[in-house]
C-alpha cells in the first residue's frame, strides 16, 4: 500500500475550514500533508490553485500562513511539508524562514530548478529539514541521479506526472514509469503528483510509485464545504 499525501492551501477557503480539513486528514489517517503558502505568481499552479492563491492573499499574509501551519501541526500527527515559491524563501532569508515555520519535515519549492538546490542545501541540512527535489517526464539520467543523491530519510522525490501545471487529466506513459523505476531502484521514495484526482488514479500511482499526492481536487472539494471534503477523503482512503 502506498502513502497518500493531501495538499491544502494555507488558510483557504478560510482559517476555520483549513483547520477543519486538517482534522479530517488526521481522522482518516492521511500519511502526510503539503501545506501551500500562496504566492502572487504561482507558475506551477493550474487555474483552481492560482485563483485560490489570489483570493487568499487578499485576506492573509505570510505571518497568518505560518500561524495556520503551526496550528495544523498540533493536530496532524504525520509528516507535514510546506510547498511554496523561491521568492518567499529568499525574501524572508533562508534561515529566518526555516526558523519561523518551525517543526516540519521538509519544504517543496515549486519553481526551484534542480541545479539551484545547492544554494539552499546547507541551511536546510543544519536544521534537519528536507529540501524536496522535483523530477519530471523530461528529467535526464543525471538529474535523476542528482535527486537521488540529495534525498534523505525524511524526504522523498516529487515526480511530476505530466508537463504543465497542476490539475488537468492524469496519465503515466511508459517513459515516465521507467524514470520512476530508476529512482525507486536506488531505495528512495518517489511520490507522484499533478493530475491525481480520484481513487482510480491513486491506485494507478501505487502500482508504480511509493505514494500519491492530491492537490487541485482536494482544494476543489474543500471549496464545496467540509462535508464534501470529508466524503472525498473517505473515498480516497477507502475508509467506507
Residue ranges and their predicted role:
Residues 9-11, 38-40, 83-87, 112, ...:
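Active-site beta-loop-alpha junctions enriched in small/polar residues
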Residues 97, 159-211, 217:
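Active-site/ligand-binding-proximal alpha/beta "capping" segment
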Residues 31, 105, 155, 210:
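Receiver (REC) domain switch/active-site residues of two-component response regulators
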Residues 5, 34, 108-109, 132-133, ...:
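Conserved beta-strand positions in the central sheet of alpha/beta enzyme cores
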Residues 15-26, 139-152, 192, 196-212:
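Catalytic cores of alpha/beta
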Residues 1-77, 147-154, 227-228, 234:
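Conserved N-terminal beta1-alpha1 strand-loop-helix module at the mouth
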Residues 39-51, 57-70, 89-94, 109-126, ...:
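Active-site-adjacent beta->alpha loops and helix N-cap segments on the catalytic face
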Residues 2-5, 75-85, 124-136, 183-195:
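Short beta-strand/loop segments at the ligand-binding rim of alpha/beta enzyme cores
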Amino acid at each position: 500500500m502506498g502513502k497518500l499525501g493531501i495538499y491544502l492551501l494555507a488558510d483557504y477557503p478560510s482559517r476555520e475550514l483549513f483547520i477543519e480539513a486538517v482534522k479530517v486528514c488526521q481522522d482518516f489517517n492521511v500519511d502526510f500533508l503539503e501545506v501551500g503558502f500562496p504566492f502572487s505568481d504561482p507558475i506551477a499552479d493550474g487555474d483552481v490553485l492560482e485563483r485560490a492563491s489570489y483570493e487568499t492573499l487578499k485576506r492573509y499574509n505570510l505571518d497568518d500562513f505560518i500561524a495556520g501551519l503551526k496550528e495544523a501541526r498540533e493536530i496532524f500527527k504525520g509528516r507535514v511539508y510546506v510547498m511554496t515559491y523561491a521568492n518567499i524563501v529568499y525574501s524572508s532569508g533562508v534561515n529566518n524562514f526555516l526558523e519561523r515555520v518551525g517543526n516540519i519535515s521538509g519544504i517543496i519549492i515549486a519553481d526551484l530548478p534542480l541545479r539551484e538546490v545547492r544554494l539552499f542545501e546547507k541551511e536546510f541540512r543544519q536544521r534537519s529539514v528536507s529540501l524536496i527535489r522535483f523530477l519530471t517526464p523530461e528529467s535526464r539520467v543525471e538529474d535523476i541521479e542528482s535527486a537521488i543523491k540529495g534525498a534523505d530519510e525524511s524526504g522523498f522525490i516529487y515526480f511530476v506526472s505530466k508537463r504543465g501545471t497542476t490539475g488537468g487529466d492524469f496519465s503515466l506513459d511508459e517513459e515516465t514509469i521507467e524514470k520512476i523505476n530508476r529512482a525507486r531502484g536506488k531505495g528512495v521514495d518517489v511520490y507522484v503528483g499533478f493530475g491525481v484526482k480520484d481513487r482510480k488514479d491513486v491506485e494507478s500511482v501505487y502500482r508504480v510509485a511509493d505514494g500519491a499526492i492530491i492537490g487541485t481536487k482536494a482544494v476543489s472539494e474543500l471549496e464545496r464545504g467540509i462535508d464534501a471534503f470529508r466524503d472525498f477523503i473517505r473515498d480516497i482512503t477507502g475508509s467506507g
